[in-house]
Each structure stands twice: as C-alpha cells, then as structure tokens.
C-alpha cells in the first residue's frame, strides 16, 4: 500500500463533538494541515459552530471567530481589513461555512466579498442539507434526496445548485472542488489557495454526513470516493473564471454511489436513469469548458 503524502502536523484537538464518521471534521483537519497555524477561521451557524466548542473551549489550535448564519463573507472581509490595518499580511483568513450558509442564507454576503475580490479563502464544506438542525433540504441537496422537509413521495425534485460555476462567474482568481476521499488533492488545493495571497479563493469540499445520509459511519470516506468516481461530484479547478482543469475522471455509474445511501432508498430504476442523465449532462458541460480553455 502506498503511503499518502499528508503532513503529520495537526491543528485539531482530539475529543471534538462531531458525529462518528463526520466528513466535515475530516475536511477541517486536512484544510488546516495545508494552511498552518497562521490562520484565523470564521465560522457561521452550522455543524462546525457546535463542533468548534463553546467559548472559551475550542477543538482547534488556531483562532476562531463565530458569526451569524448569513455573514461569513462579510465577517471574513472585516477581519481581513483589520489585519491589513495592523500590517499583518501573513495570516490567512478562512471562512468555513456549510452548504446552508453558502448556497442559501450566506450567498449575498459571499457574493459581495467575492465581487470586491477580498483577500480571503472561503470554504463550503458541503454535506448537502441543513444537518445541524435536523436534515432539512438546502439548495445543495441533490435531486432525489429524502430529507425531513422533503419526506416520503415528496423527495427533492430540483437539481443541486452549482456553486463553483456561480463563483467562477465572478471571475475570482481560484475556485475548486475537493473531497475528503482524496486528501492529497485536497491539501494541494488548499496550499495553492494559501500561496496565491490576494483575491478571493473558493473551495467547495464534499463532506459526507452519516447521520443525514443514513450510511454507516465507517463508509463515510468510501462513499465520498464513489461520488468522485461516478462524476456525481467531479474534482476540478477554475482559474480566473475561465481556465478549467479536471483533476480526476470518473468511470462508475451514478447508481453505485446512490444505492448505498438510505436517503436514496426510495428511488426506482427509472429515477436512477434520470439522475445518470443529469450527471452525464453536467460532465459533458465540464468537459466542453475544459476543452475550450485548453485551446485558448
């Protein structure tokens, strides 16, 4: 077995209150390995608002600023301005929000920060629903998902919002997807974002939630890997809003990923076929954008 090239240093304490198999805690661990100790983390209301611990306790070895649900982008912008006034250009400001605080409630503040091209790293750890408050659907929840607000036959009938494309349309220096199942790729992307210094860098991190997805905790990383291998969650980068690079190409059917999760148990073969068509369509668009950027 090949040993992964992952830094040994850790900036998380043992004993946090994340659920067993929580993808969001794995994501934070890898992110801080890349960013280092000169990092301040801005956290709005989300799962990580609880996992971080009540003041003055903390599960992280770096400073944390907790803020309101809708304000991660604005708070990170203000923190960056304060550090600049002090002449501190070395400290990295990282906003760390869930999909609810990014795709929905926080999108206005995020778009404002991005339009100003603030010198921050904004991370969405995406577990595809409002998990902290009881597994309610968000606009990051994929088509076909059963949640507490899309129960029974009322499962979600709309597609997932594409946040990377929305952020890329702002022409920011760097936007990328990452997954807890590919730690080396994820760490390299965070290191790249840290080195860039200047302008907004956005990372969309796929973070499984055993509780909300109705999966065994020990399957958390494997299912995250299946999402990439089936092109349900492709790994790619966008530079300056126009230059696309695909990091990994999937090869498995989407049903391999869907059928192992309780939140999709109600779907029929026809539903799986419909979802496969959606995945193929999105993958085709991504391939086209990548091809065009390579020719230009």
Where are these predicted regions, by residue range?
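Cofactor-binding active-site loop characterized by glycine-rich and histidine/acidic residues
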Residues: 2-122, 135, 139-143, 156, ...
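Conserved thiamine diphosphate
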Residues: 3-6, 15, 88-89, 138-192, ...
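Electropositive phosphate-/nucleotide-binding environments in soluble metabolic enzymes
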Residues: 9, 21-25, 69-73, 157, ...
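Short, conserved beta-strand edge motifs with alternating hydrophobic and charged residues
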Residues: 124, 176-178, 202-206
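Basic/polar N-terminal segments that are highly enriched at the extreme N-terminus
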Residues: 1-4, 294-296
């Amino acid at each position: 077995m090949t040993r992964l090239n992952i830094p040994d240093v850790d900036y998380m304490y043992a004993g946090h209150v994340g659920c067993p198999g929580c993808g969001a805690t794995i994501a934070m661990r890898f992110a801080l390995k890349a960013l280092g100790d000169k990092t301040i983390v801005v956290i709005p209301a989300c799962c990580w608002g609880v996992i971080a611990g009540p003041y003055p306790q903390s599960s992280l070895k770096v400073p944390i600023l907790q803020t309101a649900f809708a304000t991660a982008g604005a708070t990170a912008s203000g923190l960056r301005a304060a550090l600049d006034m002090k002449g501190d250009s070395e400290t990295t400001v990282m906003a760390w929000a869930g999909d609810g605080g990014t795709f929905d409630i926080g999108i206005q503040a995020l778009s404002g920060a991005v339009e100003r091209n603030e010198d921050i790293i904004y991370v969405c750890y995406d577990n595809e629903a409002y998990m902290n408050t009881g597994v309610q659907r968000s606009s990051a929840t994929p088509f076909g998902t059963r949640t507490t607000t899309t129960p029974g036959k009322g499962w979600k009938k709309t597609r997932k919002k594409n946040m990377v494309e929305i952020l890329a349309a702002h022409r920011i220096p760097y936007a990328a997807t990452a997954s807890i199942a590919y730690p080396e790729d994820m760490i390299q992307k965070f290191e790249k974002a840290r080195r860039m210094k200047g302008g907004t860098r956005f990372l969309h991190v796929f973070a499984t939630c055993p509780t909300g997805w109705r999966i065994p905790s020990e399957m958390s990383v494997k299912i995250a890997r299946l999402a990439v291998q089936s092109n349900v969650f492709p790994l790619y980068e966008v530079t300056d809003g126009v230059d696309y690079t695909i990091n990994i190409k999937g090869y498995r059917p989407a049903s391999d990923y869907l059928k192992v999760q309780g939140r999709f148990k109600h779907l029929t073969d026809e539903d799986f076929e419909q979802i496969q068509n959606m995945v193929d369509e999105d993958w085709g668009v991504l391939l086209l954008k990548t091809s065009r950027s390579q020719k230009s």
